Amino acid sequence: MIRMDTVTDLSLREIGVAATKVLGRAVEVRAESHIGRDLAVDSLALMNIIMELEDTFDISIPLDRLASVETAGDLSKLINDLRTRA
């Protein structure tokens, strides 16, 4: 059985990979990292990161679900929720 913390770690790592690719700079992502403040991601960059993550995980992230996402941990949880429903 796959442990949930392993799945979360994978999601956080992939969020970092996507953010690094989109932003063109190294990004250290932790669960508590605030997407706008700590990662310095604006709304356009966030949408590009979301598209990268959708491709990586073969999921579709509804825009209305993003309204509650403030931290990388929130985004990781959303990804994991969508992956378990797919």
Curated annotation (Swiss-Prot):
Pathway(s) it belongs to: Lipid metabolism; sphingolipid metabolism
Pfam annotation, one family: PP-binding
Gene3D superfamilies, alphabetized: ACP-like
Reported phenotype of the disruption mutant: Deletion mutant cannot form bacterial ceramide. Mutants are impaired in growth at elevated temperatures but are resistant towards the antibiotic polymyxin B.
Keywords: Lipid metabolism, Phosphopantetheine, Phosphoprotein
Superkingdom classification of source: Bacteria
Signal peptide coordinates: none
InterPro entries: ACP-like_sf, PP-bd_ACP
Annotated GO biological process: sphingolipid metabolic process
Modified residues (O-(pantetheine 4'-phosphoryl)serine): 43
SUPFAM superfamilies attached to this UniProt entry: ACP-like
GO terms for cellular component: membrane
Carrier domain segment(s): 6-83
Function: Involved in de novo bacterial ceramide synthesis.
Family assignment from sequence similarity: Belongs to the acyl carrier protein (ACP) family.
Protein name: Probable acyl carrier protein CCNA_01221
Lineage, uppermost ranks: Bacteria, Pseudomonadati, Pseudomonadota, Alphaproteobacteria, Caulobacterales
